[in-house]
Amino acid sequence: MDYTVVWLAAGISFLVTLVLGPVTIPLLQRLKFGQTIRAEGPAAHMAKTGTPTMGGIMFLIGIAVAGAVLLVSNIPGRAEGLVVLAVTLGYGLIGFLDDFIKVVLKRNLGLKAREKILGQLVFATVLAVVAVFKLGRGTDYIIPFSSGISFDLGWWPFFFLTLFVLLGTSNGVNLTDGLDGLASGATVFTATAFAILALVTGKIGLAIVLAAVVGGCLGFLFYNRHPAKVFMGDTGSLALGGALGAGAVVTRNELLLVVIGGLYVLETLSVIIQVISFKTTGRRVFRMSPLHHHFELSGWSERKVVRNFWLLSFLFSLVGLLGAQDFWLWLSNR
C-alpha cells in the first residue's frame, strides 16, 4: 500500500502552519490578543503576559487545507477522515469562541462551563451517531493488550462513553497546555500512534487527517517552543483533544486511548486529586496542579519539564501501540 499521500498530508499541514506564523503572530499582537497569566502560577510565568494566544488557528488552517486537498478522492477511510476533521474543526470553533470572549470581550472566564460543555456534547453526539449508523463502527470495544477480545456494551453505554471520551480528551489536552511546547509536542506522539493505527486498518483517509494533525503541531512548535512566540489557546487545545478523541472512537481504540494519551490522563488526575484532597482535608498533594506545574515548583526548569513530559508521551504512545491487536495483525502479515 502506498502511504505517500499520508506523508503529503503531514507535509502540507506543516508548511501551511509554518508559513502562517509570520503573518498570524504579528496580527494577533496588533489586535492585542495577549495571554493573561494567573497570579497564583509560577512566578517565572509572569514574563509570558501578553504573549499572543489563539495561535491554534494556524495549525487548524493547515489541517483543514491538507484535508481539503487530499480527501477529495474516494480513498479508503475517507468518511472516517471527514468525520474526524469535522469534530476537530468543531472543537476548534468552541475553543475560538472561548478565547475570543476572554481576550477580546475581556470576560476572564470565557464561555460559561455549561456553554462550553454543551458545545462539546453536541459534536460528541454527532460523532457517536455517525460512527454507529453511518460508518458501521458498532458498539463493541476491543480490550487492549489482548488477542483481540472485545465486548459489546450496546448503544446507550457506547453513546455516553463516547461523550466521556471526547470531553475527557479535549479537556485533558487543555490542561496539558500550560508550558511552552508541551501540548503541541506531546500531541505529535499521540496523533502519530493513532495515525499508525488508522493505516494498519486500511483507513487511509483517517490517517491523512491524523498525519495533518502531526504536521500542524510540528509546524506550530517552531513558534511555540520555549520561549514561545505564540500560544495555541483553547482554539488549539480543544481541537487537538477533539481530533485524538474522535480518532480513538473511529478506530475502536477508546480504551487504548487511556494508555496512548497517558500524559493527558496524568495531568487530569493531578487536578482531580488536588481538588478532592484540598476540599476534604485542606491539604494539597501537589505543590500546584496540573502536574507540570508541580515539577516546576520543585525546581525543574520549564525546558526540563517539557523534555521529560515529551519523553513520557512518546513512551505512552509506544506502549499503547504495542497493545493494539490491529498493529500486531498488520505486522504478522508483512
UniProtKB/Swiss-Prot annotation:
InterPro entries to which the protein is assigned, alphabetical: Glycosyl_transferase_4, PNAcMuramoyl-5peptid_Trfase, PNAcMuramoyl-5peptid_Trfase_CS
Catalysed reactions, semicolon-separated: UDP-N-acetyl-alpha-D-muramoyl-L-alanyl-gamma-D-glutamyl-meso-2,6-diaminopimeloyl-D-alanyl-D-alanine + di-trans,octa-cis-undecaprenyl phosphate = di-trans,octa-cis-undecaprenyl diphospho-N-acetyl-alpha-D-muramoyl-L-alanyl-D-glutamyl-meso-2,6-diaminopimeloyl-D-alanyl-D-alanine + UMP
User: A GO molecular function for this record?
Assistant: metal ion binding
Topology in the lipid bilayer is annotated as:
Multi-pass membrane protein
Enzyme superclass (EC): transferase
Q: Keywords of this protein's UniProt record, alphabetized?
A: Cell cycle, Cell division, Cell membrane, Cell shape, Cell wall biogenesis/degradation, Magnesium, Membrane, Metal-binding, Peptidoglycan synthesis, Transferase, Transmembrane, Transmembrane helix
HAMAP family membership: MraY
NCBIfam families attached to this UniProt entry: mraY (TIGR00445)
Protein name, UniProt field: Phospho-N-acetylmuramoyl-pentapeptide-transferase
Organism from which the protein derives: Desulforamulus reducens (strain ATCC BAA-1160 / DSM 100696 / MI-1) (Desulfotomaculum reducens)
